[in-house]
Amino acid sequence: MEKKLGLSALTALVLSSMLGAGVFSLPQNMAAVASPAALLIGWGITGAGILLLAFAMLILTRIRPELDGGIFTYAREGFGELIGFCSAWGYWLCAVIANVSYLVIVFSALSFFTDTPELRLFGDGNTWQSIVGASALLWIVHFLILRGVQTAASINLVATLAKLLPLGLFVVLAMMMFKLDTFKLDFTGLALGVPVWEQVKNTMLITLWVFIGVEGAVVVSARARNKRDVGKATLLAVLSALGVYLLVTLLSLGVVARPELAEIRNPSMAGLMVEMMGPWGEIIIAAGLIVSVCGAYLSWTIMAAEVPFLAATHKAFPRIFARQNAQAAPSASLWLTNICVQICLVLIWLTGSDYNTLLTIASEMILVPYFLVGAFLLKIATRPLHKAVGVGACIYGLWLLYASGPMHLLLSVVLYAPGLLVFLYARKTHTHDNVLNRQEMVLIGMLLIASVPATWMLVG
């Protein structure tokens, strides 16, 4: 395995995977569920939680540098084979669904250039024309990554720099157009008819979604030139992304009043740019979104392919997925990931699902892997500061599970259940020194049984 990724490439990988499609729709998404007061509290909670999670990853890369398989290996080392697999399965599903959402939003953005009231070509990214285009992009990126992760990471660095230009222009114009009276209008969201704390809870999956990818450097840490760069890259990217998100959401509420902002079509940043600089604003943001999402898609494809590969090398996924090609790219894992993405694209066309549906599912699947990072640090930490970070990361993880609501937890059970069958099959393809204990066998049985009523309740 080649170790060629330096600090700049690792930082770009993390930042690009976070700054994807979400930031361009963030103004409307937040305005629809939260007042300025709730938004400030929500970002405070999320900022603190994500920084604790980033610090937990930084500490773990320092005290357990040999665990270079990312969040999957933390869960496995701390809580056994089954929990480790569940972390890998949940993270991989999140990555697959995130990739589908990026392909959908790219062609939704292209509709700004092609669609008219008389002609709906790309629509919301779920027309047959969009699916054909998304499939072509999917396989172009697939063969690019087969040429080697370093090649893809270099292209991603350029894409990350390019996406910051339209975001920077938006922030500068929004600062110039910001009106404090507009920002303070209905500051606590009385018009929403929901208490402030409930509004805060409603922002949690949205704010988590735009930070998914924070673990990017940890996932590819086995390919890092210097292991100490992994933690630095994570912190640099988190602080940069948090600054961008705060500016974009808070300034937007000072340009357009919250009720009006909540009605703007996504990507809502395009509508705001039209308010600030005329028709050209929409084109600039749509073009920026396309570059941004393509960069994020490239990052997520690298990370998505890495997970089954690493899990297979640790005997959690079937042995075939541990294969690499001559360029040291995880070829079998990449084929698995992109075939699943292709199937999901066809399902999107058949069901008419959109970006927001995919956002919710992807956010839900990442909750357990993130919680297990904090739990592992809490388990092995010896210093008081490290224990405090572990406690904080665990509390944030539990809060997210609570905030996501019971229906989303049911969805998690349904999506984890088929993974257990993969886990049991994988154990047959490897020679294992350790046998599953009674608690793990009971947990497998409970999850499989619980998936039946959970499926019925979701369908019903």
From Swiss-Prot:
Keyword entries, A-Z: Amino-acid transport, Antiport, Cell inner membrane, Cell membrane, Membrane, Transmembrane, Transmembrane helix, Transport
GO-annotated biological processes: amino acid transport
One GO molecular-function entry: antiporter activity
Periplasmic side: 26-38, 114-125, 179-201, 257-282, 353-357
Sequence intervals crossing the membrane: 5-25, 39-59, 93-113, 126-146, 158-178, 202-222, 236-256, 283-303, 332-352, 358-378, 385-405, 406-426, 440-460
Cytoplasmic membrane side: 1-4, 60-92, 147-157, 223-235, 304-331, 379-384, 427-439
Compartments in which it is found: Cell inner membrane
InterPro entries for this protein: AA/rel_permease1, Amino_acid_antiprt, APC_superfamily
Gene3D superfamilies: Amino acid/polyamine transporter I
Membrane topology: Multi-pass membrane protein
Gene Ontology CC annotations of this record: plasma membrane
Catalytic activity of the protein: L-ornithine(in) + L-arginine(out) = L-ornithine(out) + L-arginine(in)
Pfam family, one: AA_permease_2
Family membership noted in the UniProt record: Belongs to the amino acid-polyamine-organocation (APC) superfamily. Basic amino acid/polyamine antiporter (APA) (TC 2.A.3.2) family.
Primary role: Catalyzes electroneutral exchange between arginine and ornithine to allow high-efficiency energy conversion in the arginine deiminase pathway.
Protein name: Putative arginine/ornithine antiporter
Organism the protein comes from: Escherichia coli (strain K12)
Lineage summary: Bacteria, Pseudomonadati, Pseudomonadota, Gammaproteobacteria, Enterobacterales
Gene name tied to this protein: ydgI
